[in-house]
Amino acid sequence: MLGNSRIAQAALVAALAGAGLVAPAPAHAAVSRAELALRWAPVHYQDVDATGSHALGGKSDYLTRVDFDGDLVGRDNWDDAATAGASFAAAAYYDVVETSTHWYLTYFFYHPRDWVDHPFFETEHENDGEGLTLAVEKDGSTYGVLRGMVTVAHSDFYSYTPAGGTWTSGAESVDGTVQLQSSPHDSFQHPATAQEAKGHGLKAYPQITINGDGIVYYPSTVGETPSSGNDRDVQYQLIDLFAADGLWAQRNNTSLFVSLGTFAGDDSGDCGQGTWDCTTDSANAPWGWDDGNDAPARGELATDPAKLSAAYFTIPGSLSRTYTYNPYSSAAAALKKAAETLPRTID
């Protein structure tokens, strides 16, 4: 029996590895960054609106991959979302950077459209990228303990701490409590987050919640396609931003990005047709996120989260500012120049 159990466990690990991630490690094993990302990834509530032609029957609010249409071209995504070949298999991107005291996990949620349902006095745009960064303290346990969360809602950041946590308001006031919720697909308590329909601003649940139709996404090694706009159990696949062919590696791809951290998007085709107003180049990758009226620079929520955490929160004990793992540092000069020179993008 013991031998069969080990064989079954090995087979499970091999299957998960083939999917790009492995299951969370037992307490005695060293944890990988992929395992950390899976353990802490949010239970995610997505409000869905099916009103009007730009909603695509609700699909404009479905999470998906940046290459949902089979290419890494930013300027065809609005129209390709309406084609029969578009994939809405659920996905979210992640990265992990690390110091001696903390792990910082960023999650990036992508939609092909930031849309509106009426054509007057409103704007929409091609591509939409919002998300969050978690600060997890290395407390000696396998996965650490969640201390803080900062989310991106358009051009504003919102900060949260878990109930009973030790971090408090710093230069920015804490905006609320991040709930921890269970998943039917694993044994962990996950942060609960939510995105609004249409514009997809992201906050802690239930500061945003499902109003009528909506999808509840659960982190996984596989990406499921919602059965409808009112599916309450959809698994989303986690994709490593730092993979060899990942989004970070594509940062200088001019078909996908118009500048460092800003997606290329235009107003051709259906976006901006008639009396709708469609802005161009209006969505950001994590290294382009910018609150605009806080001290940390453009992109630092993802690229220097220790700095941002020290600014946003009052933190007891030690918080190292020296990274032991941070692939963003390879482009430090370019990121600094982008923060100093690029116009602010309002997502």
What are these language model-derived features?
Residues 1-29:
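Secretory targeting and sorting signals
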Residues 30-131, 140-347:
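A domain-level signal for the mature, folded cores of soluble proteins
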